[in-house]
A protein has these predicted regions:
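Gly/serine-rich nucleotide phosphate-binding loop at the start of the catalytic core
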Residues: 1-98
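Intrinsically disordered, low-complexity coil segments
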Residues: 31-40, 83, 115-116, 144-148, ...
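Short amphipathic alpha-helical coiled-coil/interface segments
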Residues: 47-50, 99-107, 275-283
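Stable alpha-helical structural segments in soluble proteins, enriched in small hydrophobic residues
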Residues: 57, 95-111, 385-398
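Long, hydrophobic, amphipathic alpha-helical segments used as structural scaffolds
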Residues: 58-65, 107-118, 194
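Short coil/turn segments at secondary-structure boundaries
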Residues: 62-63, 72-73, 114-126, 267-274, ...
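Acidic carboxylate diad motif detector
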Residues: 74-185, 246
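Positively charged, helix-rich recognition surfaces that bind polyanionic ligands
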Residues: 187-426
Length: 426
């Protein structure tokens, strides 16, 4: 059997095995304090060299985008008004190959978008490359101890200490990773594959940093729930209304004013830019924390019924600012891809808002009308709650009132979060 045939056979076996597995990405933070000054500089130089190689290829894609490009030991880049030669010393061969493959994938995506009738441009130069693919475990990277607290990267002499390796279960198969640079530090995003039959078990029986099993306390609600999405939150069929708003912080606005006054290219501007990136990352983390808590609440139900709303269109309407800061689309995506709760998707053209949940009368309702008033039976209730009742009726279920255990669990999950408003609607 030739090498090409062995690769083809292995790829077929892997694809067959992946059908029974689910990918999970674990985020590990690199402990920069454990590195020497020299090793820290080499780690950050990986991202600089990745940028140089990327821009070198993009400058002349027709002649430079080829297989042998990853073998280059130096590239020519434009620095100001002149060209300079920069060495590629720290990037390993597989890291360079992954960067070349990333450019090919970007070109393919542009080609597909053009075939769909969209207007496309061309690949542009990058000021920063903040992620480096590590495409093969045991070659590009590997954990050097059983606790998964040390990682050896191809091209670097010493192992790097990482925090959070205890999250990765022993039953999983580590496939690939990405080295990601953020304002708060450098992270390793490890992609692991877990058998679908073991996914819930490994999630419930997590281990702490001392490798001690700590089962999760997981209260479940043995009933179905319907959810209606809003630009600023969600409404559940049990009457719970959860709203949140993540706006620009005063510190962010102040930093934006400060950086506009700094001279371009100066060190002071660079310092403010780092602070600005950290503030943006903080806002993103706050938003993601709320999405995680909403998902945690919904996963406790047996079934979640929701309508296939075209949230992409909401970005173009009068609620565009609200929908961009609420991350409602992320909640919908998690429900669609989740294995921890069964979901029922209702067609987006079902008139759930226009229909009375009491008598079935269908009538027009303005967007400004927050209360549904039926002209036939006189039913008056919140328009979003009325929509959730109709979602339940479409799958043959009755509505349910909020129970004390649901209310207590919701309050416990969100805590005293000043950015989240929890209320009951009728």
């Amino acid at each position: 059997m030739t090498k090409a045939e062995r690769i083809k056979q292995t790829r077929l076996e892997t694809n067959q095995k992946r059908k029974e597995q689910i990918p999970v990405v674990y985020q590990l933070k690199v402990n920069l304090n454990s590195l020497s000054k020299k090793d820290r500089q080499r780690l950050f130089f990986l991202f600089s060299e990745a940028k140089w190689l990327y821009n070198y290829i993009v400058a002349d894609i027709d002649s430079r985008l080829k297989y042998e490009t990853y073998k280059l030991s130096e590239v020519e880049i434009k620095a100001g008004d002149k060209f300079e030669t920069r060495p590629i010393e720290n990037l390993s061969s597989q890291m360079r190959q992954a960067i070349v493959e990333r450019i090919k994938q970007s070109l393919y995506a542009l080609h597909k978008s053009k075939d769909n009738g969209n207007k496309v441009g061309e690949l542009k130069f990058k000021s920063f490359v903040n992620s480096i693919p590590l495409k093969q475990y045991d070659v590009t990277f590997k954990f050097t101890n059983e606790q998964k607290t040390k990682v050896k990267l191809q091209g670097l002499e010493k192992s790097i200490r990482v925090l959070g390796g205890h999250q990765i279960p022993k039953e999983c198969e580590i496939a690939k990773a990405e080295l990601v640079r953020k304002a708060s530090g450098i992270y390793l995003h490890a992609t692991c594959y877990i058998d679908k039959s073991l996914f819930i078990k490994t999630w419930e029986n997590r281990v702490n940093r001392k490798q001690v099993s700590k089962p999760r306390e997981w209260k479940t609600f043995n009933q179905a729930i319907a959810i209606d999405f809003k630009p600023t939150g969600v409404v559940l069929s049990n009457g719970l209304k959860i709203e949140w708003k993540i706006e620009e912080t005063p510190r962010l606005k102040k930093l934006q004013r400060t950086i506009s006054r700094k001279q371009k290219g100066s060190k002071n501007r660079q310092k403010v830019r780092v602070k600005l990136r950290k503030e943006y990352e903080h806002i993103t983390n706050v938003r993601e924390d709320i999405v995680n808590k909403i998902s945690s609440l919904l996963y406790r139900y047996d079934t979640v019924i929701y309508q296939d709303d075209n949230i992409h269109v909401w970005h173009k309407g009068q609620f565009s600012k609200s929908i961009q800061t609420s991350a409602v689309g992320e909640i919908k995506r998690r429900l669609r891809n989740s294995l921890r709760v069964s979901t029922v998707l209702i067609d987006r053209y079902q008139p759930t808002t226009k229909t009375c949940s009491q008598c079935g009368n269908e009538q027009e309702i303005e967007l400004s009308d927050r209360v549904y008033r039926c002209a036939i039976c006189g039913n008056e209730m919140d328009r979003d709650l009325n929509a959730t009742y109709n979602l339940l009726k479409l799958v043959g279920l009755d509505r349910s009132e909020v129970r004390p255990v649901e209310h207590e669990t919701t309050v416990k999950i969100f805590g005293a979060n000043p950015k989240v408003l929890i209320s009951l609607v009728q």
